[in-house]
Amino acid sequence: MKASLLNKLEILQDRFEELTALLGDAEVISDQTRFRAYSREYAEVEPVYAAYKEWRKVQDDLEGAQALLKDSDPDLREMALEEVREAKEQLLTLEAQLQRMLLPKDPNDGRNVFLEIRAGTGGDEAAIFSGDLFRMYSRYAEKRGWRLEILSENEGEHGGYKEIIARVEGENVYGKLKFESGAHRVQRVPETESQGRVHTSACTVAVLPEPDEQAAIEINPADLRVDTYRASGAGGQHVNKTDSAIRITHLPTGIVVECQEERSQHKNRARAMSWLSAKLNDMQTSAAQNAIASERKLLVGSGDRSERIRTYNYPQGRVTDHRINLTLYSLDDILSGGVDAVIEPLLAEYQADQLAALGD
């Protein structure tokens, strides 16, 4: 194992022991803010510490077996040789695991997200496909036990959505969905196509991490124009009775956010402000991310909204992710919420990029 990696693990072991002591300290236990913070850090550090402890045990076993290779008993030497082989294999596996565990964490991975889906080229068919994508992500969220709430929707004339915005809340939401941003293309025969010709349409997806209070950008109220209007669409008898829907325009950037799903104007405003903060944060970070991706020629992770990232081909039952040249013939499963079939290989490729960068 590299000396730099060993040094990091020794520091982490010291921190683990320190955290163990802190979590048993009566003064810390009585301060719930500190206790929760230390508990979260402990939960992150403990698996790495356990893997490092196992690595050290196997390293000791290897040294013991190597010493037996000099024994005069041939049977003992043969047994020791097998133990050396097994220990070396275990060490390689554990070292790879520890390297992955020590990769820099994206601080946004644990955040909730705003999911934006917009119809692009293709007219009605693009709007219908936006609806298909929204159902795909809704089913994926349901499988993972996440909570999804619609903030704003603009339905297409023949089904689907010209635009739909949702908030997704749960464990590691951004960590799973962050590589879904980009242009999604569909190739299929529309129901209105009498000649049976395959049409190509596209939608854009944006996944924005929801900032917490500390990370939220400070927004000058003078930079905002706030309009109220009557909600339209789903909502039962309450719709159109009160001006509960909110539209906020950030004048310096021209960004517009709307929220109409809550019955309370106050709740709609709070959701809209959180979404606006996420969009302003995204503007700041996107340029830096694109520069890094360009410099390192990353296949995954640029998050460029205009980049065509995936094609859904209905006649062939095929889904292709163009960033990693991944082709799967399981279109129905993926659209039914089995998005992990694409997400997991993307995350693996991203980790490989990070490991390569660590080796530079």
Swiss-Prot record:
Belongs to the prokaryotic/mitochondrial release factor family. Peptide chain release factor 1 directs the termination of translation in response to the peptide chain termination codons UAG and UAA. This is Peptide chain release factor 1. Gene3D superfamilies: 3.30.160.20, 3.30.70.1660, 6.10.140.1950. Keywords: Cytoplasm, Methylation, Protein biosynthesis. One of its GO terms (molecular function) is translation release factor activity, codon specific. Signal peptide: none annotated. It comes from the Bacteria. InterPro entries: PCRF, Pep_chain_release_fac_I, Pep_chain_release_fac_I_sf, Prokaryotic/Mito_RF, RF-1. NCBIfam families: prfA, PRK00591.1. Methylated by PrmC. Methylation increases the termination efficiency of RF1. It is found in: Cytoplasm. GO terms for cellular component: cytoplasm. The modification N5-methylglutamine is found at Q237. SUPFAM superfamilies: Release factor (SSF75620).
